[in-house]
């Protein structure tokens, strides 16, 4: 019988070799992917808008038109968590409620609520630097920079003035420069012993002094519970004294005012204390 050729087979215990062309194709694909892998980066973490800040003064009214609110002070601990400082207390705000101001963070896109303008009787909502303390006494118990107000000290609330939204002394800038201002800083000397500016601090609303966007926003004293303001935040003397004694410029203190609904919406993105704690 003729001998038939035996088919070429690999031994059963040896794996089949890949075809040379297929092997080269996979190597080329892997090499082509290397630049893409090298260029891939982990998305950066969302920056903390309050980075560096270790003290917060938080004011939360119920709504935009509410004239009363609760204030809670907060200190950031070594682990980065906000811890309440003392008990929350009642404060009064603008006679017309509050409105978005010009602070350290932009007004959120599509945010509800009014915008602050001069003379609207609304306190400013947002996050603001806490500026200089001021008062009638030569000095106070506070580490904050302090301005001892004089009879001719004014905050300029005239939008057309080049000194708009600035604390000045008439004997320095001239009497004509303070003409028209309705904010003498020695209210006691101009209005029969008025105590409201006896102690307080500047809330740095509209630091670029954009004309008409609100000026001379302070935290100051109130003469009686429930007394509203022209746009400031007012409290009892003992509460103001505790705040001023606690605040330090090294902690980069910030003032936060947000109605409850906005606070709930923004507290995570802005790294604020939880609302249920902020309003106790």
Segments (PLM) and residue ranges:
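Bacterial N-terminal signal peptides
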Residues: 27-35
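Bacterial N-terminal signal peptides that target proteins for export
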Residues: 4-27
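Cell wall/extracellular polymer interaction/catalysis modules
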Residues: 41-230, 238-280
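A conserved hydrophobic position in a structured secondary element of the catalytic/binding core
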Residues: 235
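Proline-rich low-complexity regions
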Residues: 20-22, 35, 95, 123-124
């Amino acid at each position: 019988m003729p001998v038939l050729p035996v088919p070429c087979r690999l031994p059963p215990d040896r794996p089949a070799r890949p075809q040379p062309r297929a092997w080269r194709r996979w190597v080329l694909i892997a090499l082509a992917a290397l630049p893409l892998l090298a260029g891939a980066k982990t998305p950066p973490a969302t920056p903390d808008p309050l980075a560096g800040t270790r003290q917060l003064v938080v004011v939360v009214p119920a709504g935009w038109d509410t004239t009363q609110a609760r204030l809670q002070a907060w200190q950031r601990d070594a682990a980065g968590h906000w811890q309440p400082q003392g008990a929350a207390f009642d404060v009064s705000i603008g006679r017309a409620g509050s409105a978005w101001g010009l602070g350290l963070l932009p007004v959120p896109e599509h945010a509800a609520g009014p915008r602050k303008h001069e003379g609207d009787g609304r306190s400013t909502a947002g996050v603001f630097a806490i500026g200089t303390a001021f008062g009638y006494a030569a000095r106070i118990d506070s580490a904050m920079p302090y301005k001892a107000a004089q009879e001719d000290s004014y905050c300029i609330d005239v939008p057309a003035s080049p000194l708009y939204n600035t604390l000045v002394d008439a004997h320095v800038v001239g009497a004509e420069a303070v003409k028209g201002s309705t904010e003498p800083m020695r209210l006691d000397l101009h209005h029969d012993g008025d105590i409201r500016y006896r102690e307080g601090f500047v809330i740095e609303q509209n630091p670029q002094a954009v004309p008409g966007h609100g000026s001379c926003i302070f935290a100051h004293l109130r003469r009686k519970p429930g007394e509203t303001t022209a746009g400031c935040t007012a409290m009892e003397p003992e509460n103001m004294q505790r705040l001023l004694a606690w605040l330090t410029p090294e902690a980069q203190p910030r003032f936060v005012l947000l109605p409850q609904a906005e606070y709930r919406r923004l507290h995570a993105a802005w790294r604020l204390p939880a609302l249920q704690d902020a309003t106790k």
